[in-house]
C-alpha cells in the first residue's frame, strides 16, 4: 500500500468533492478510528466537516496497538486516521481499500516541564540523556507508536533500565501534560503537539540526531458502505483550511 502526500492527494481526489458536490452526498454517519495524538486536530475539524457536509462523525481515539486490534477484529469502521504503523500490520492492511494511503499530518518529539520549573538542556543527545537520568520521574504513553519510539530513544541512549524505575506510564496522550502540570511527573516526553497545554512549558524538541517524525495517514475501509463520504472527509483533511488547523495544533500538515 503506497502513501501519498496531501498535495498529491488533493490533486488526485479533487477538491471539488469537498466543496459544493459534497453537499449532494446523502447525509450519513461515519465511524472513524484515529490515533490519540490527532484528538486536538480532529475535534476541531470534525464539526467543521459536519456543518459543511451534513454527515455525522463518530470518532474513536486510541493507541496504535489498540487500533490494530480493532481493525483486525473485524469491527465496523469507515476510515482511519492513524500512525503509519497501523498499515504495516499485514492483517490490518488487508481491511483497507487497496489504494495509496494519504498522509494527513506529521509531528516530532519533545520534552516538557511544569510551568515555572527550570528548563533542562535537551539540545544534544548527551544533554537529553543527562536530563532524563537526573529527572526524578518522567511520563509518556509506552503502549503507542510514539511511545515505542520513546523507548527506542532510551535504548539508543543506553538508559532503558534506569528509565523503567522512574517512568509513570499513561494510557492516553492527553494525560501526559496534566500529569506534569500537577507535579505527578517531572518530565513529559512525547509528540510535541500533545505536550501543548496549560500548566506546562516546553524544555525543547529532541536533538536532531534523535528526532523522528511520526506520520499520521488516512485510508478508507474496504467494506465501508459509506466510501464516498469517507473519501470526502479525507479530502477535506487535505485542504488549506484543514492544514491551518493542523498547524495550529502543533503538527506539520501532510
For each of these PLM feature ranges, what is it?
Residues 1-4:
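N-terminal secretory signal peptides that target proteins for export/translocation
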Residues 25-75, 81-93, 97-98, 102-107, ...:
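Exported/periplasmic ABC-transporter solute-binding proteins
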Amino acid at each position: 500500500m503506497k502513501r501519498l502526500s496531501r498535495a498529491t492527494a488533493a490533486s488526485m481526489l479533487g477538491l471539488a468533492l469537498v466543496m459544493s458536490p459534497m453537499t449532494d452526498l446523502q447525509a450519513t454517519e461515519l465511524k472513524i478510528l484515529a490515533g490519540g495524538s490527532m484528538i486536538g486536530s480532529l475535534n476541531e475539524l470534525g464539526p467543521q466537516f459536519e456543518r459543511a457536509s451534513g454527515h455525522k462523525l463518530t470518532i474513536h481515539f486510541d493507541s496504535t496497538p489498540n487500533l490494530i486490534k480493532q481493525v483486525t477484529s473485524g469491527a465496523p469502521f469507515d476510515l482511519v486516521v492513524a500512525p503509519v504503523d497501523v498499515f504495516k500490520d499485514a492483517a490490518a492492511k488487508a481491511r483497507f481499500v487497496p489504494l495509496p494511503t494519504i498522509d494527513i499530518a506529521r509531528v516530532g518529539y519533545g520534552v516538557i516541564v511544569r510551568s515555572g520549573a527550570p528548563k533542562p538542556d535537551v539540545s544534544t543527545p548527551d544533554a537529553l540523556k543527562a536530563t532524563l537520568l537526573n529527572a526524578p520521574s518522567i511520563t509518556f504513553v509506552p503502549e503507542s507508536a510514539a511511545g515505542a519510539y520513546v523507548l527506542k530513544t532510551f535504548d539508543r541512549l543506553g538508559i532503558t533500565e534506569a528509565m523503567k524505575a522512574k517512568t509513570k506510564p499513561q494510557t492516553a496522550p492527553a494525560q501526559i501534560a496534566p500529569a506534569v502540570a500537577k507535579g505527578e511527573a517531572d518530565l513529559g516526553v512525547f509528540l510535541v503537539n500533545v505536550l501543548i497545554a496549560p500548566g506546562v512549558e516546553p524544555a525543547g524538541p529532541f536533538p536532531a540526531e534523535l528526532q523522528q517524525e511520526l506520520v499520521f495517514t488516512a485510508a478508507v475501509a474496504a467494506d465501508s458502505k459509506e466510501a464516498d463520504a469517507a473519501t470526502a472527509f479525507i479530502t477535506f483533511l487535505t485542504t488549506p483550511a484543514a492544514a491551518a488547523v493542523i498547524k495550529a495544533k502543533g503538527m506539520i500538515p501532510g
